[in-house]
Amino acid sequence: MAASCILLHTGQKMPLIGLGTWKSDPGQVKAAIKYALSVGYRHIDCAAIYGNETEIGEALKENVGPGKLVPREELFVTSKLWNTKHHPEDVEPALRKTLADLQLEYLDLYLMHWPYAFERGDSPFPKNADGTIRYDSTHYKETWRALEALVAKGLVRALGLSNFNSRQIDDVLSVASVRPAVLQVECHPYLAQNELIAHCQARNLEVTAYSPLGSSDRAWRDPEEPVLLKEPVVLALAEKHGRSPAQILLRWQVQRKVSCIPKSVTPSRILENIQVFDFTFSPEEMKQLDALNKNLRFIVPMLTVDGKRVPRDAGHPLYPFNDPY
């Protein structure tokens, strides 16, 4: 089953369901990509920081291109610029490393992963003696100008943002000659992001949801927090429609025209996650899922300081999650 697409302002078509690769083991991700392509996925979401772009590149080389499973022009590949590479001099070398690792000549979409910059260098998480992060003063508007040059060179087809708030999006738009096409943020029924989605849609940005199933497999999960996949409303709709809870959560997003990048390395789940285009929710069913919103954010980078878990970057002036949206 092929995923339906949304049209970006660049004219590109982005499939509404893509394969996420965050937390996918290098040893497992190659087979996962190959399987996903074989069952109709045409959108792969990557990032330099995930540490597995080389293996993804091997899968793409074997399966994408003339005479192979998928022609390159049918595939939509996203990657992301890491925080240590925001300095304008570091942007193109970072992209070229990603392209070399993925064995691609261009990316369909390149995102700035976070609004703030870490200290330049090869350590992905440069730290002070007390364990806190060492930041760099480069502003995302300077980074954006360097990203725009990549489009002019034909290395990237579209640019976007990840983990930016509404104010920061407008700040980028105020200087952009290449406007961002996509915002990628955490989004699921517990964190519906309605205001942020409306803000983006009014400005011609499409939204991609990461952790659309609630990311209950992450290492720092609080055992007390609610589990989206076990939410009674979700289970009831799954039973009613003869679907899995994951399919219910993904259908809710694609019906709102929000693209999703569920991560899996399990063939049965990879297949299940794209089988969400042959059923529809009524307006009442959509409202039931909308009503689950509690502005509950799961993905907040944390640090342990003096034995306590604290948000790693919350004190940074460009931290995105201190604003209402």
From Swiss-Prot:
GO cellular component, one term: apical plasma membrane
Annotated site location: Lowers pKa of active site Tyr: K80
EC number: 1.1.1.2, 1.1.1.372, 1.1.1.54, 1.1.1.19
Superkingdom of the organism of origin: Eukaryota
Reaction(s) this enzyme catalyzes, per UniProt: a primary alcohol + NADP(+) = an aldehyde + NADPH + H(+); L-gulonate + NADP(+) = aldehydo-D-glucuronate + NADPH + H(+); L-gulono-1,4-lactone + NADP(+) = D-glucurono-3,6-lactone + NADPH + H(+); allyl alcohol + NADP(+) = acrolein + NADPH + H(+)
Enzyme kind, highest EC tier: oxidoreductase
N6-succinyllysine: residues bearing it: K127
N6-acetyllysine: modified positions: K127
Binding site for NADP(+): 11-22, 45, 162-163, 211, 213, 215-216, 263-266, 269, 273
Location of the protein in the cell: Cytoplasm, Cytosol; Apical cell membrane
Residue(s) carrying N-acetylalanine: A2
Pfam families (UniProt xref): Aldo_ket_red
Location of the active site: Y50 (proton donor)
Keywords from the named record: Acetylation, Cell membrane, Cytoplasm, Lipid metabolism, Membrane, NADP, Oxidoreductase, Phosphoprotein
PTM sites of type Phosphoserine: S4, S38, S211
Gene Ontology molecular function: any one: methylglyoxal reductase (NADPH) (acetol producing) activity
BP-aspect Gene Ontology terms: aldehyde catabolic process; cellular detoxification of aldehyde; D-glucuronate catabolic process; D-glucuronate catabolic process to D-xylulose 5-phosphate; daunorubicin metabolic process; doxorubicin metabolic process; L-ascorbic acid biosynthetic process; lipid metabolic process
InterPro entries linked to this entry: AKR, AKR1A, Aldo/ket_reductase_CS, NADP_OxRdtase_dom, NADP_OxRdtase_dom_sf
Known role: Catalyzes the NADPH-dependent reduction of a wide variety of carbonyl-containing compounds to their corresponding alcohols. Displays enzymatic activity towards endogenous metabolites such as aromatic and aliphatic aldehydes, ketones, monosaccharides and bile acids, with a preference for negatively charged substrates, such as glucuronate and succinic semialdehyde. Plays an important role in ascorbic acid biosynthesis by catalyzing the reduction of D-glucuronic acid and D-glucurono-gamma-lactone. Functions as a detoxifiying enzyme by reducing a range of toxic aldehydes.
Family per record: Belongs to the aldo/keto reductase family.
Subunit structure as annotated in this protein's UniProt entry: Monomer.
Entry protein name: Aldo-keto reductase family 1 member A1
